[in-house]
Curated annotation (Swiss-Prot):
Keyword set, alphabetical order: Cytoplasm, Lipid biosynthesis, Lipid metabolism, NAD, NADP, Nucleotide-binding, Oxidoreductase, Phospholipid biosynthesis, Phospholipid metabolism
Binding site for sn-glycerol 3-phosphate: K105, G136, S138, K191, D244, S254, R255, N256
Involved pathway(s): Membrane lipid metabolism; glycerophospholipid metabolism
Gene from which the chain derives: gpsA
Entry protein name: Glycerol-3-phosphate dehydrogenase [NAD(P)+]
Amino acid sequence: MKIGVIGSGSFGTALGSLLADKGYEVTLWCRNDSQIESINRNHINNKHLPDFTLPEKLTASKDLRTVVQGKDMIVSSPPSHALTEILREIKEYLPEKVPIVSASKGIENGTLRLVSEIFESELPGKYHSYLSYLSGPSFAKEIIQKVPTIVSIASRSETTARKVQEIFSFLYFRTYWTPDVIGVEVGGSLKNVIALAAGVSDGLGFGQNTRAALITRGLNEITKIGLKLGADPMTFLGPSGMGDLILTCCGEQSRNRTVGFRLGKGETLEQILSGMNEVAEGIKTTQSAYELSQKLGIEMAITNEVYKMLYEDKNPKEVVKDLMKRDLKREGVLV
């Protein structure tokens, strides 16, 4: 089986490494010449995962057509803001009747489209039943280290979901399939916004009580917007919901939590981003999530405060203070 992976960041590389470990022939799309040479000659992604040796069956190419054309499965893992442009480029030579697996997370700025909506808008209908979406608590480094990991595979087609589930499942990587595409996407996108808030809390020196509060109320916000969009609420208790939320809010490898932590310590967003090698999706997603909540008429207090901190220069200390001063409410999933 030949597999093309679009995106040579840490997560795309980790998924490619997993599939190559299973014996599949994997080609990774990469824009950087030195990175391509390092992967092909030394089996190391020198830009994103310099401390790990990659399988010999994983190679890299700068030619997107070479990566995609004639493959038996496509894995798409670019930053969500780059997805539309990439799909418009590849749809002329994208193979038909093969699984297309998206691992991108986010809500497109301006259009407010989920990743599935981008795929279904940009690709002809003949591809739609072959689309699936992978999400769950899975740091790239730990996948490459073969740490036991679980994720969700969502697809509107059970046949596609089960096929992708079988291809990805391995000794250290277990997958659960679900038809709830919207729920998996909403959980995977909005957890990054909540992780920014959790990082701010840690950076300000608050304790685990505060982090637990943010995770709990963050899940409430994710569930509210998910239900409004038609998701199954049970999805948010699974790997792509609570599982990913806990990992991203608590794990030291979390880019979004790290950005929040540094903001809490007093750095500016510009200072933080200037030294980052990977994309923190939560920054762009916060803007889209805020606009989507306004459009749908849903109160999302944590998201609103993170938005004010990122885009209106609100002091992180004031963010936490204002969250604690909100009107008292009855406990419940949707309040």
